[in-house]
Amino acid sequence: MLRRYFAAALVAACCATTATAADNDSPAPYHVGSAMRVFHPGVARNWRGAQTEALVTNLWYPVDADIPEAAHTIDEGGRPLFQGHALTNDAPVSAAHAKYPLVLLSHGTGGTAASLDWLASALAANGYIVAGVNHPGNNSLEPLTYEGFMLWWERATDQSEALDGLLADPVLGQRIDTARIGAAGFSLGGYTVLELAGARTDLQAFLNFCASPAADAICHPPEMQRLQGGAPVPAHFTPQMSASMARSSASYRDTRIKAVFAIAPALGEAFNEASFSGVEIPVSLMAGTGDVTVPVETNLHRVAGFMPNAKVTLLPGATHYTFMDTCVPAVVERLARICQDPPGVDRDAVHTQAVEAALDFFNHTLPATTQ
């Protein structure tokens, strides 16, 4: 029974600083630098069926405002998909401060770190280093795999091991204020950062929900159609998959992380009353009231009910994909599901609200030092 529900429901689970600009009329204090790192963890990630064994990580960071930025688009398959923030590649980190706070970034199912460029760039422009892992087996840079799609809890290990790599990095490691590390995530990435905060998964609770009449869209995410070209679910779990399932309810708390910001967090039904007993750091939850992909009632509200001290922000009318980058005009009609918002919803304005909330949250929970 568990195997049947795991195949039918769990595979389908889940779609998806220092100085700040005081208001929308004030320019951000920094320009945005961009770089990439490839970290090789102790356990190679290709056991998930992924094409890469490494943790490919996008970086955004503050650079001096006199360094020119260039406009760019975020491409997929060699074609522009999203409008990116202006940035400069591989420029030196600003010398205005010796160290900067760090925010780890976790994307949603089948997405990429770059699909959250709107948030990462804004944080960097306001004095944060941001690192976004492209989760192996669950990103749009390579085929989705069953392991990457089903074994959600493994994503927290990606973040922690990328953090290990960052702190050891000869260029950026010494520029990170290790007392000021946070995490932000969208959709399945929202679930991921809650795990980093100490939340524990109740896999059976989620399976029961998706097998019940109450099952909703979280049990059948649209990204499921991309799962290895619609190939049948494997009849047998590999030893690695079985071992992973056995640790699904483990704690993935990373004590280096001091605060988490979860946008449209998914898998609310994979938590129970005891799941958050180990969460002792500040948590902020945000979603749009128009989200039908990760319904607010069974996800954000359920999680918030277990964490009465969490900050909750609901943005009227915003849908799930409103929290992805703004699409380039050429693809808006073709990719209507992720590119188009309801009448009256301005995606860029929603992003501005979300950025302001994230900056306010992290500025208070990762307070500035004299460095």
Regions found by a protein language model. Name each.
Residues V328-Q371:
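Catalytic active-site module of serine/aspartate enzymes centered on a nucleophile-bearing elbow/loop
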Residues G148-Q174, T178, E195, Q204-P232, ...:
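Alpha/beta-hydrolase active-site loop
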Residues A22-V103:
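Domain-level recognition of soluble alpha/beta enzyme cores
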Residues V279, L285-A287:
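Short beta-strand/loop motif that positions the catalytic acidic residue
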Residues G185-G189, V193:
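Gly/Ala-rich beta-loop-alpha elbow adjacent to hydrolase catalytic centers
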Residues F271, V292-T298, F323:
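Conserved alpha/beta-hydrolase "acid-adjacent" motif
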Residues H85-Y100, L105-E142, V292-P295:
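Short substrate-entry loop that stabilizes the transition state in hydrolases
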Residues S275, I281, P295-G305, C327:
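Short alpha-helix in the alpha/beta-hydrolase fold that links the catalytic acid
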